[in-house]
């Protein structure tokens, strides 16, 4: 299930909003010194400014058959309301069919990609984005972030920010030792009618970065 945590107006459908998992992100003193580290073993993301953690959050990683790439990268693109170019839905009137962009179910359908909010790309077709943070490898190589952490991560990541992805990170022994993790990964998927609409993208200003003490 992909958690979007979107709230509608009265009379509309309401999706569950989970507040138990809510990592705190802090503004950097020098944005040019920010580094993003990913531990595949512990499935954790550490956004660091020197030795100071700005955001520590769980992530979902790629399947063994579609692994998250390891290496040293840099942020190359950011799109707050990105949709997948590969996976999504085919729409014709009130009919919505899940599928891939390469295979339409018939004539007259239009393709709408799956929402990948707060997209932060570090390699062509690979990036961080909102999604269910499963405790086991689950993605096609991208790194999913919880809705309550993705906005802050998006604010911290700038074009050119270094991204280091490795099996382990030094921070695993301290920041990543028994961290809280989200438990809402198995929530039911939102309705397809929501996922194809602009309402799939939630922008919550309460998730802004905080000032460092």
Indicate where each model-derived feature is located.
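Post-signal peptide N-terminal segment of mature Sec-exported envelope proteins
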Residues: 18-48
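Short, charged/polar surface micro-motifs in flexible loops or helix N-caps
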Residues: 80-82, 125
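Glycine-rich catalytic cores of cysteine/serine-nucleophile enzymes that process amide/ester linkages
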Residues: 40-44, 48-79
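Exported/periplasmic cell-wall-interacting domains
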Residues: 12, 16-17, 24, 70, ...
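Bacterial N-terminal signal peptides
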Residues: 1-10
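Non-transmembrane, membrane-adjacent beta-strand/coil modules in membrane-associated proteins
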Residues: 83-87
């Amino acid at each position: 299930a992909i958690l979007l945590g979107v709230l509608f107006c009265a009379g509309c459908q309401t999706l569950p909003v989970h507040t138990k998992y809510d990592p705190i992100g802090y503004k950097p003193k020098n944005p040019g010194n920010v580094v993003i580290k990913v531990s595949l073993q512990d499935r954790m993301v550490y956004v660091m400014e020197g030795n100071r953690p700005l955001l520590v959050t769980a992530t979902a990683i790629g399947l063994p058959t579609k692994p998250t790439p390891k290496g040293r990268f840099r942020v190359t693109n950011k799109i707050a309301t990105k949709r997948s170019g590969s996976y999504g839905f085919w729409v014709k009137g009130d009919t919505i069919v899940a599928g891939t962009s390469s295979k339409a179910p018939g004539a007259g359908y239009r393709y709408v990609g799956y929402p990948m909010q707060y997209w932060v790309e570090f390699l062509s077709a690979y990036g961080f984005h909102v999604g269910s943070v499963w405790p086991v490898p689950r993605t096609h190589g991208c790194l999913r972030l919880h809705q309550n952490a993705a906005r802050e991560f998006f604010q911290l990541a700038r074009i050119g920010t270094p991204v280091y992805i490795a099996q382990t990170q030094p921070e695993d022994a301290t920041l990543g030792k028994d961290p809280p993790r989200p438990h809402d990964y198995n929530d039911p998927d939102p309705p397809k009618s929501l996922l194809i609409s602009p309402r799939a993208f939630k922008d919550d200003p309460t998730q802004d970065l905080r000032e460092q003490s």
